[in-house]
Amino acid sequence: MGKDSKKHKKERRRERSPSTSDSDEERLQKRLAEQRSLKKDEKRRQKEEMKKNESAEEKRARRMEKKMRKDAKRKDADAEDTLIPPELNYTNLNNPFNDTKLTQTFVWGKKLEREGKSGLTQDEITKQTSQRIRKNLHEAAEFKRIRDSRAAAKEDMEMMKRDADLRAGQISDTKEREFQMDQIKERTRIRIDQGRAKAIDLLSRYARFADENPHTAKIPDFELENPMEYLKASCKSVDDYEDLIEDIKTYREVDGWAKNETWWMDVTRIAEDEIQKKAAQNRGDVHASVQTEVQNMFKNKSIDELLKLEDQMDAKIRGNSGNKGYWQDLDDQLKVFIARKRLREHHGRVLRLQLAIIKEEQKKEIQQQESEELLPVAEVPPQVKIQKEEEEEEEEDEDDEKISKKVRRKIDVQTLDDPELDEPERERKWRALTGDQLDDVTRELYRIGCYSPTYISADDTMPGIEILDEQADVDNLTERRNRNRGTLPSSSAASSGAPQGASSKMMAIAREGMEADESIFGAEEQLAAQRHLWSDKYRPRKPTYLNRVQTGFDWNKYNQTHYDQDNPPPKIVQGYKFNIFYPDLLDMTVAPRFGLTSCEDPDFAIIRFKAGPPYEDIAFKVVNREWETLHKNGYKCQFQNGVFQLWFMFKKYRYRR
């Protein structure tokens, strides 16, 4: 069935003749012509109706518009027929080529014959030439537009780059100021720690604390005093005050001139007044008795009243008063008096804020302890309650007095044991503590750690318990050791003068020269059990130590290629500094020894230190690399003052052809 239908379709296709398709095309064309004629007749009819109904003004406007359209069309046709486009405005007499036949069409006959265009008329050649010229002008305009857009984009990019450079410069300036400020703070800290603080160090530290937010500020770890006391303690001569004025200018250039402007101006004015006093210059025509009366007159006035008085004196100085020198000198005294008074008031505000912070912290601690140790209590009679309230008020007054006394020396324990601090920073903070502060901090840490037994005072001990004096016990132990060593009494007496400070002296020797890229090293290795013949005389024990490992970057060719200062390579171990303490060594004439042994990992080795009784051997696991054994390269191996020091650096291998 399917094959028969396909045959019929093929037969029908064959039966169609060209005459049939031509007749269909003719009918379509006839129908389209009829539709076009109908539209044309409709348009003509609408136009005739519009002409019948229009007024004279509308008819005049319509004809004028029609004339303008014809003129524009004729101009366009003339422009197309002309060889030179009108926008060039070139003539035979005025053109950059000095061509007197510029508007005439050049006919290149041979070229036209080769291109097969020899049959073109003069008008056709002119038209093609004009089109080619217009095309070239259009391309030139397009190229100019692209060039201008590229130039504009390039200018925009340069402007954006300048803006980025300007912002980067501002950021770098800000970072530079921050870096300089950090350096100033670091210099201040170092000079204060070393006991050679200058006046600018104390004043800048005071100003930075005064700028902090009272709600978020921490209690300072230094004593707050009136800035004038800092000047008296640090400035002894005219040169000191002159140096202070220059230091203040340098500090304000870094920190900002507008920051604490009044406070720094007051300090500068006081320093200038002290320079005049030190130089023993006369203070105008004011006699000493008159000067005392002037000071008494200033004393009972407020800052606002003194400022008004200063304005009055300035007006008299600018006016035609009789004795300008007198008023000028009086004005100078008034300015110094105002500066001192402002500094005292500012210092009082700082102390009150600090006292309020400490009270708030004390209240929080008391509330926390009460919430943790809250127990149910029985009903108390009203009289007992009143008595207890009076006692509590008295205790609060006493606590306030104690708090005000401890304002200048309370230390935040959290900052000392902050795990985010590196070892040198933590060590610096501990060294900055005074003796009383160190006692308070250690007691607080002992209480926080919940160690056993709990810390109590000597008055709370049970009867029958003997309390030994620490110094006496150390003296007794030192005397017995010297007796066993066979040393002379004179030498033991000389050495017993500071037995307690021996370990601290050793620690100071071990910590000497510690740098920022060094860290404490205590990876001690476990050794086999040791038997000692001298164990019946002295208890064998491991020596104490303070070791350091030095790390840094190895800028070899590979790391220089793949890393930079912003993205540094991993740090590697560059050396070790072993400081092992043997203060109770029986035979001080024999220095401790050390030896290296291999371990399972070939990249590491075991270094073992041997000293003799009463100390056991001690070992550490170190990196297995070749040492630098020259003194100029940092090698040190010595035994002095009971401290065995072994410092060494690893050799650096460099590729050589």
From Swiss-Prot:
Principal location: nucleus
Keywords of this entry: Coiled coil, Cytoplasm, Developmental protein, Nucleus
One Pfam entry name: Cactin_mid
Subcellular location(s) of the protein: Nucleus; Cytoplasm
Cross-referenced InterPro entries: Cactin_C, Cactin_central
Stretches for region Disordered: 1-83, 369-406, 472-503
Acidic residues bias locations: 389-401
Record carries keyword Transmembrane helix: no
Compositional bias annotation for Basic and acidic residues: 26-60
GO biological process: gonad development; mRNA cis splicing, via spliceosome; mRNA splicing, via spliceosome; positive regulation of cell migration; regulation of cell migration; regulation of gene expression; regulation of Wnt signaling pathway
Annotated GO MF terms: RNA binding
Tissue specificity of this protein: Expressed in pharynx, intestine, vulva and spermatheca (at protein level).
Biased composition (Low complexity): 489-503
Record-level GO cellular component terms: cytoplasm; nucleus; spliceosomal complex
Keyword Coiled coil attributed: yes
Record function comment: Plays a role in pre-mRNA splicing by facilitating excision of a subset of introns. Plays a role during early embryonic development. Required for the distal tip cell migration at the end of larval development and for gonad morphogenesis.
Annotated family: Belongs to the CACTIN family.
Protein's UniProt name: Splicing factor Cactin
Protein source organism: Caenorhabditis elegans
